[in-house]
Curated annotation (Swiss-Prot):
Gene, per the UniProt record: yjhD
Top-rank taxon: Bacteria
Protein name as it appears in the record: Putative uncharacterized protein YjhD
InterPro entries per UniProt: Adhesin_E (IPR043088), Adhesin_E-like (IPR031939)
A Pfam family that the UniProt record links to this protein: Adhesin_E
Length: 76
């Protein structure tokens, strides 16, 4: 999410063999993120507005990258 431009994107998809990130880590896709605008009146817009109000000092540091290799490998 970009709080200043009111745009969103998705950078990575991870697929598991079962629902809710359970089971085997099957595949990972890291598409090139394309920024798209979102409506401030949408549910996403309402949530993002709340999230954008969080002060940076209150955020936890970014977690390390996942070292696990997917069973089917990475695909793009």
């Amino acid at each position: 999410m970009n709080c200043e431009t009111k745009q969103r994107t998705q950078f990575e998809c991870i697929y598991f063999s079962q629902y809710w990130a359970k089971g085997d880590f099957i595949a990972k896709r890291a598409p090139i993120g394309q920024w798209e605008p979102y409506s401030e009146e949408s549910l996403l817009g309402i949530i993002v507005t709340s999230v954008c109000r969080i002060k940076v000092a209150m955020l936890k540091p970014e977690p390390p990258r996942d070292p696990h290799i997917p069973l089917m490998g990475d695909f793009n």
